[in-house]
């Protein structure tokens, strides 16, 4: 990291403090500044997951949506929230800073949660209670009540997206990437970011879910509202310690300009004079920037340099071309993680319904089915510090490298664990249906004589997969991306989650349509005990294996850009 002298104190080049003055080394940044970000993540994720983990039951039992629609609405809500992280990352890189984007986004989420709290508290804004257990006698939410619901939900979604697109990058920017110590601290930050994310999730799926089930949803939404408000206060308390990256303009403009310039030059007819001029311009450019040279990868983009001869707006520097190459080479890795997140989406919805049919008592306490994620969360809380303080130091000694385990190796482990998770889920569903059949309860709503702890097995594997993949992706995109595109690139981690949820919502109707057209009953109908959820899980397992082989193809060919990423 280059520094400039500011009096007797060196300043961070390209960074400012919260007053828009020069950020100074020793006063701004470091682990203290990042600690505020970690505390904020606990509160922010608590507010988010407190509702998301139980939302499918809220829509089904209080808004009277069908099982299929409530599941679809939840996956769409989650997907939209994560996809909007791209917008937050783009705005942070292009026009604002991660500091400003977080404050705006958290305020938007706060407003959305207030609306949801008001609706849950006022019966006039809710559909009337069902007159009987028959679904036909239940009035599904509609009209202005539905509008109130979805405005609140998608304000929350917009706020979550902005937070996810800015907060991880804001924390990672606090470290000096020019030193081994700074890079190691940044790696530790990403591990503990996932740890703190899990801390918030633990409170959400235990304490807040219990409140929602026993005290009412107005209390659940109220806790989330207070939590996001506290996150804003904690974030502001750290303002004097942060160093905020100064935006350098739209990264999308750079990408579009390079791609367009390369396309125009490639498609235009080349005369001998054009070739001469191009070589002349390129030689002149190389004289100005002797330390930079075009690489041999994605050579089709090298033609963007020639675009300077005819189009002033399309003039590209070597650095811009190389930056776009880096982004394009990361996209296949991004694409290979979508399937894992599709598996995560399926288990986060159907596993809740499975657990609702099983015996959820531990001693004399009846565990809410929405609290099932407590199992992977607890495991992630144990695994994250173990990974950072035991596994990584050991790996550094063995590999003699700064990073120990590469980002791509870490992501690969996560993909393998997701395959195991889906196989376990299929076997557990077979066991659950066998118990239902033997007890004569296939068509009954009575609790099955089988403990819900069986469901915990698939959650443990998927939670481990999520830990390895999410932390690996966040650090991979941040360290490999050009500095002007880091927030946007880091947002790809959340965009992968979004596309996984969208793929999940698309797969269910497709599978039902295909199985129905084959003369069978739809695999995923309304009656869970008559479904073929086990076959659906096996299908997901097979697709995950194919996806992993696809990942290996790209991971083996990827060449790291950043210092400290190579093992």
UniProtKB/Swiss-Prot annotation:
Tissue spec. comment: Expressed in flowers and siliques.
A cellular-component GO term for this protein: membrane
Signal peptide location: none
Membrane topology designation: Multi-pass membrane protein
Subcellular location: Membrane
Keywords for this protein: Membrane, Transmembrane, Transmembrane helix, Transport
Main localization (coarse): membrane
Keyword Cell inner membrane: no
Pfam family, one: PTR2
A single MF term (Gene Ontology): transmembrane transporter activity
SUPFAM superfamilies, per database record: MFS general substrate transporter
Keyword Transport: yes
Segments crossing the lipid bilayer: 30-50, 70-92, 99-118, 147-167, 189-209, 219-239, 326-346, 374-394, 411-431, 448-468, 491-511, 535-555
Gene3D superfamilies: MFS general substrate transporter like domains (1.20.1250.20)
Family matches, as InterPro entries: MFS_trans_sf (IPR036259), POT_fam (IPR000109)
Record function comment: Involved in abscisic acid transport.
Record family assignment: Belongs to the major facilitator superfamily. Proton-dependent oligopeptide transporter (POT/PTR) (TC 2.A.17) family.
Protein name per UniProt: Protein NRT1/ PTR FAMILY 4.5
Lineage, uppermost ranks: Eukaryota, Viridiplantae, Streptophyta, Embryophyta, Tracheophyta
The encoding gene: NPF4.5
């Amino acid at each position: 990291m280059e520094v400039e002298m500011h009096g007797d104190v060196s300043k961070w080049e390209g960074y400012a403090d919260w007053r828009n003055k020069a950020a100074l080394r020793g006063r701004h940044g470091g682990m203290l500044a990042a600690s505020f970000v970690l505390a904020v993540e606990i509160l922010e994720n608590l507010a988010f997951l407190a509702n998301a983990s139980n939302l499918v039951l809220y829509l089904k039992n209080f808004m009277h949506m069908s099982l299929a629609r409530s599941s679809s609405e939840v996956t769409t809500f989650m997907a939209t929230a994560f996809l909007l992280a791209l917008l937050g990352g783009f705005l942070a890189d292009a026009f604002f800073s991660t500091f400003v984007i977080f404050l705006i986004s958290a305020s938007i989420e706060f407003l959305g949660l207030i609306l949801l709290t008001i609706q849950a508290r006022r019966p006039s804004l809710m559909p009337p209670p069902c007159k009987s257990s028959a679904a036909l006698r239940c009035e599904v939410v509609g009209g202005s009540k539905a509008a109130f619901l979805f405005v609140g939900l998608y304000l929350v979604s917009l706020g979550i997206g902005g937070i996810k697109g800015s907060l991880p990058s804001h924390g990672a920017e606090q470290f000096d990437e020019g030193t081994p110590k700074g890079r190691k601290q940044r790696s530790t930050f990403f591990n503990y970011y996932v740890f703190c994310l899990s801390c918030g999730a633990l409170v959400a799926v235990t304490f807040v879910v219990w409140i929602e089930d026993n005290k009412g949803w107005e209390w659940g939404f109220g806790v989330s509202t207070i939590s996001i408000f506290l996150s804003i206060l904690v974030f502001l308390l750290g303002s004097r310690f942060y160093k905020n990256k100064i935006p350098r303009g739209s990264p999308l403009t750079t990408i579009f300009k390079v791609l367009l310039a390369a396309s125009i030059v490639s498609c235009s007819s080349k005369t001998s004079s054009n070739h001469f001029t191009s070589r002349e311009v390129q030689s002149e450019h190389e004289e100005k920037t002797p330390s930079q040279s075009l690489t041999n990868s994605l050579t089709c983009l090298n033609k963007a340099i020639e675009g300077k001869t005819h189009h002033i707006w399309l003039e590209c520097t070597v650095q811009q071309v190389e930056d776009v190459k880096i982004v394009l080479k990361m996209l296949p890795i991004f694409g290979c993680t979508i399937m894992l997140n599709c598996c995560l989406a399926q288990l986060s919805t159907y596993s809740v319904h499975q657990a609702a049919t099983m015996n959820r008592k531990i001693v004399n306490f009846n565990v809410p089915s929405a609290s099932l994620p407590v199992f992977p969360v607890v495991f992630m809380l144990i695994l994250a510090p173990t990974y950072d303080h035991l596994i990584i130091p050991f790996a550094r000694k063995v590999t003699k490298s700064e990073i120990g385990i590469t980002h791509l190796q870490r992501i690969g482990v996560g993909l393998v664990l997701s395959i195991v998770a889906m196989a376990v889920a299929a076997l557990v569903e077979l066991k659950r249906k066998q118990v239902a059949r033997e007890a004569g309860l296939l068509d009954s709503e009575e609790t099955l004589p089988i403990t819900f702890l069986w469901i915990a097995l698939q959650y443990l594997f998927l939670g481990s997969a999520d830990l390895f993949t999410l932390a690996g992706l966040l650090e991979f995109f941040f360290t490999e991306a050009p500095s002007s595109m880091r927030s946007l690139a880091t947002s790809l981690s959340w965009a992968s989650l979004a596309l996984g949820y969208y793929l999940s919502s698309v797969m269910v109707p497709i599978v039902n349509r295909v199985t129905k057209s084959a003369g069978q009953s739809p695999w995923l109908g309304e009656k869970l005990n008559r479904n073929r959820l086990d076959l659906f899980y096996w299908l997901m397992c097979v697709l995950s294996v194919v996806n992993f082989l696809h990942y290996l193809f790209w991971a083996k060919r990827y060449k790291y850009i950043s210092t400290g990423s190579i093992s």
